[in-house]
Structure formats: C-alpha cells, structure tokens
C-alpha cells in the first residue's frame, strides 16, 4: 500500500466520510448518546494501540506492557493516555491538546503513510490496526467539538504549544537516559528526536540545525500559526436564516467565542429574542445583550425587544428539539 494509490485514496475518502457523518449525527442525538459515541471512539483508538503494542497484534502472545509503555514516547501512541484524560469533563487542556496537536499528527500519518506499509496489502492486520487507531484519534476530538465538549479558543494556543514541546523534551531526556544505559539502540527513534523518517520538513529542519531534538524547535512558529488558523476556522462567526411559515427564528449555535442564542421568535414589532449568553471558565452563565441593544444576524440589524427568563443548556436543548420537530429550527 503506497501513498497516492487507488486503495489509499479510497481509504482516505471512506475515513473522511465516516468522521464527517459522525460530526453530523452527534449534533442530533441526546447528550447521553453523545457521551456514549465519544467514549466508544476513544475506546476503539486505545484498544487498537493496546492490541498492537501490548499484545503484539496476536491473541496468543499474551499481554506485555513494556512495549506499550515504551510507545508512549511516540506522538500518536500517546493518545493511549491522552484521550482517556480528555474524557474528564473539567479537564480542558488534554481536550485542547488532542484537538490542536494530536488530531493533526494522526492525520499526517494517514496522508503520508509509514514506509513499513509499502509491501503490505490494505487488509493486513498491521495496516488496518494502525489505520483505525489513527482515524479514531482524529474522530475523537472532532466529535467532542461537534458535541460542544471542546471550544478551541486562541487562549489555549500557547499552553498547548508549550505542552507539545514539553512532551518532546521529556521524550528526549528519557531516550538519552536509555541510550546511555544501553537500553535503546542508536538507530531507534521516538517522535523524530533522532531520525526524521524521511519526512521532508523534518529533513529540512535537521539540515538547518543538525542536532537531535533541537531541530524540532524550528517547528514552533509553524505550529503556533497552524493552531491560530485552526482556531479561526472552528470559531468562525455563524450567519443565521429564518425558516417556517411563522417566520420563527430558532437557533442554537456558536457565534464567535462560545456565545449562544438560546431561543427566539418573531412579533409584529420585530424579532423577539431570548438572552444571548456565554459560559465563563467557571461554567457560570453571563447575559451579553440586554433589551434594546442592536445585534447583527447575517446582513440584518436586529433590535432586542425583550430578554426572556434565563434558561439552562438542558432547557435550551429541549427547546431546539421541539423546534426541530416543528420544522422551524435552523441548525447553525
């Protein structure tokens, strides 16, 4: 299986379709099933990593934790620890790390492919295991984002970047210790510390700074720029439209940085809207606009005539569900 082959392209298309379908479906189902779907994605990814490195891709060899622990020094296999941490509700940094960096790292593997795959068919256990684990390392944070678990704000860009290079630093220190103790051969490498694995950008970095580990710091400004673009894309402003015979405007979507229109309708005097609200870092709700203020929805300037009683996220979810059944709900 080689890069750009028909099999490779078909697998990429099928994987992208599955992940996209999951993003659509997870928005439409109740929260409990969203949680089940995300946990299942994390379990699939972690199970593939465990089966490959903890069991040697065989049910007969038994469990050997040493290779599994060693492979936590590899960027993509670190998802075995990272993604379960991202399931903890108030633990935001692992979610941001998974969304900004791990998802990107896993996607590069699917596009570039490992040189080990060349003599293998697509249905080989080694290929399928690696493909599925990397696919769900992408799907897990994307589905978390679609379900509202992750909001990739720019304030997390520098902390995540620091964690990325903190991870590489820890890997480098451990590798140096193992090399000094004769526990790791010189030709072995984790996370591009010593070897570039033929990847052009790392080859270039190593030519500019031919020193193990330190050449990776040339990637820092590139990562920060990429994270900024990623944040801008997933936090872009949303334009709304009205639908339904009664001209009801009923929207539940993200505007810019976690601002949410919970419920709205139409009156003879103009749009009759509820509170525009957001959650602060402690989870407290804050009303952003008061009656009489003008806001812009699409190309229309709308005056808020009233703010209805504050409603919780669960109540808002039930409202949008009812609107959807009426056919007047606009999914943002």
Predicted regions and their residues:
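Secondary-structure capping and domain/repeat boundary segments
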Residues: 238-332
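Juxtamembrane "helix-exit" motif on the non-cytosolic side of transmembrane helices
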Residues: 51-61, 111-122, 177
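Membrane-interface helix-boundary motifs at transmembrane edges
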Residues: 25-37, 88-96, 147-158
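Membrane-interface transmembrane-helix boundary segments in multi-pass integral membrane proteins
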Residues: 1-13, 157-162, 166, 182-228
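Aromatic-anchored segments of alpha-helical transmembrane domains
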Residues: 43-53, 102-114, 164-173
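Membrane-embedded alpha-helical segments of multi-pass membrane proteins
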Residues: 9-17, 72-82, 98, 128-139
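Membrane-proximal helix-loop-helix units in multi-pass membrane proteins
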Residues: 85-147
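Alpha-helical transmembrane segments in multipass membrane proteins, preferentially the mid-helix core
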Residues: 18-24, 82-83, 136-155, 168
């Amino acid at each position: 299986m080689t890069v750009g082959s028909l099999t490779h392209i078909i697998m990429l298309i099928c994987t992208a379709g599955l992940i996209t379908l999951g993003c659509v479906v997870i928005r439409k189902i109740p929260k409990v099933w969203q949680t089940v779907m995300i946990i299942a994605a994390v379990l699939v990814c972690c199970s593939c990593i465990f089966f490959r490195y903890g069991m040697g891709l065989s049910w007969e060899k038994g469990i050997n934790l040493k290779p599994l622990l060693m492979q936590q020094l590899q960027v993509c296999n670190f998802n075995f620890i990272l993604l379960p941490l991202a399931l903890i509700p108030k633990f935001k940094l692992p979610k941001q790390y998974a969304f900004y960096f791990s998802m990107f790292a896993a996607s590069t593997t699917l596009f570039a492919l490992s040189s080990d795959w060349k003599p293998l068919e697509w249905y080989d256990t080694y290929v399928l295991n690696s493909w599925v684990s990397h696919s769900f390392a992408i799907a897990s944070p994307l589905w978390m984002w679609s379900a509202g678990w992750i909001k990739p704000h720019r304030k997390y860009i520098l902390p995540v970047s620091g964690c990325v290079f903190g991870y590489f630093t820890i890997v480098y220190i451990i590798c140096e210790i193992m090399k000094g103790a004769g526990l790791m051969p010189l030709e072995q490498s984790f996370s591009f510390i010593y070897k570039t694995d033929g990847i052009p950008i790392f080859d270039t970095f190593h030519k500019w700074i031919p020193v193990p580990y330190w050449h990776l710091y040339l990637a820092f400004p590139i990562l920060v720029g990429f994270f900024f673009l990623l944040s801008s894309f997933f936090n872009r402003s949303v334009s709304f439209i009205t639908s339904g015979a009664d001209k009801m405007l009923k929207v539940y979507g993200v505007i810019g940085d976690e601002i949410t229109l919970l419920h709205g309708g139409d009156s003879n005097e103009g749009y009759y809207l509820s509170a525009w609200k957001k959650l602060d870092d402690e989870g407290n709700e804050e009303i952003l606009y008061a009656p009489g203020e003008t806001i812009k929805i699409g190309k229309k300037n709308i005056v808020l005539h009233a703010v209805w009683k504050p409603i919780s996220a669960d109540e808002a979810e039930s409202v949008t569900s009812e609107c959807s059944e009426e056919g007047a709900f606009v999914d943002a």
